[in-house]
Amino acid sequence: VNELEISLKDAHFWGMDEWYEDGSEVSMEHPLSFEKADRELCFDRIREDLRPPEQNLHFPKADVTAYRESWNGVRCVVMQGGQGDVKHWAFNDPLRREGAYADEPPSPEEYRSLATRVVELHPITLSQNARTSGGGNVTMVPQQAITVGPQETWQAERVSIWQAGTHDNPLGQRLTALMISKGVADSAVPMSLLADHPNVRFSYYLGGLGSCSVEMH
């Protein structure tokens, strides 16, 4: 952006998620704050005369009203994300299998009706974020988060998923590509619900694709 002098004055950015703790979104003082990372790793590095105005940066808050309304009347060209071990995008984790979902997960239609919301995080997600971002300290990772939902995801013209081999394993990277390409949508594998989105692109880092061969260590 700086080198090519691309003005982002008319651009909008939506953060996909933020940690939720003690009834509120975490502050940027939290070491794992997504807003802090977005600002320090991206926007603070863009020349001030080129970066988007503050009012065009939308970060999820405990009260999701303003965040959800910010999607109205604005074109979201691309939603850029990744895939977690639990097969989520953002923090759209599989729902807890209890109550009405004890025997069957919610239908794809029911899951796709979800909007930006506060969610309970799957234990696999907690472990993954401790491993990839917290130096292995799982007690640092909040057990809830605010996440962009399928409703907003379907407002994006394209959903782009980078598979770098860091956040999911060799089987998982292949599984969701197979399910999406075959039109198999199952909310137990949330990423597979993108089978019904009109424009999904997976980009793989070959060095991180790995092998599904079985080997004991």
Where are these regions (language model features)?
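Short, conserved loop/helix-junction motifs that constitute active-site signature segments
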Residues: 2-11, 51, 152-156, 194-198
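Ligand-binding beta-strand-loop-alpha-helix segment within the catalytic cores
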Residues: 4-80, 140
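Short, flexible loop segments at the rims of nucleotide/cofactor-binding pockets, characterized by
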Residues: 57, 136-141, 179-182
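A short secondary-structure junction signal
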Residues: 69, 89-104, 171-175, 214-215
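A glycine-rich beta-strand to alpha-helix segment
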Residues: 74-98
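Class I SAM-dependent methyltransferase SAM-binding "motif I" and its flanking Rossmann-like core
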Residues: 90-142
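ATP/nucleoside-binding phosphotransfer catalytic cores, i.e., glycine-rich phosphate-binding loops
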Residues: 148-217
